Amino acid sequence: MKVSSTGGVSATGASRAKPAGGSSGFSLPSVNAASGAASTASVGGLTGVGSVDALLALQAAGSVGGPLERRKRAVRRADNILDILGEVRIALIDGDISHATLDRLSRAIREQREATDDPRLEGVLNEIETRAAVELAKLQARAG
């Protein structure tokens, strides 16, 4: 998750003019009206900081090392390997497989895979990598 707006933080509520009579809120007798307005503004600023902290915490939940992000990267890597295997299949049917395709498949298999928290996903990823390694070994034996 990315924060895309850098606009200022506004106060949470609209300020209303207080009646001239007795106010029911807390006030210090020694504080004049100007410093009272300044303290009200500082409280509103603190509220804004709290919301920024909440946004940063939310952003950290979807960070690079988060389980959801690791899972997405693992699935993306598996999709890439499956796409290359599809190209290999088509090239075998056509009878013309290039060294570039074999090299891409080899590099895709050698990439370090991140562990995920999902055992079923890990099993599928292992099967995809095993299939890719077997196909690569067969093609290299045929070519060499």
UniProtKB/Swiss-Prot annotation:
Xref: Pfam families: FliX
Compartments reported by the entry: Cell membrane
Gene Ontology CC: one annotated term: plasma membrane
Entry keywords, A to Z: Bacterial flagellum biogenesis, Cell membrane, Membrane
Membrane-traversing stretches: none
Biological process, per Gene Ontology: bacterial-type flagellum organization
Keyword Cell membrane: yes
Protein's membrane topology: Peripheral membrane protein
Biased segments, Low complexity type: 1-15
Matches recorded under InterPro entries: Flagellar_assmbl_FliX_class2
Sequence segments annotated as region (Disordered): 1-28
Keyword Cell membrane included in the entry's annotation: yes
Superkingdom in the source lineage: Bacteria
NCBIfam families: PRK12787.1-3
Role, per record: Required in an early step of flagellar assembly.
Annotated protein name in UniProt: Flagellar assembly protein FliX
Organism, scientific name: Caulobacter vibrioides (strain ATCC 19089 / CIP 103742 / CB 15) (Caulobacter crescentus)
Lineage: Bacteria, Pseudomonadati, Pseudomonadota, Alphaproteobacteria, Caulobacterales
Gene that this polypeptide is encoded by: fliX
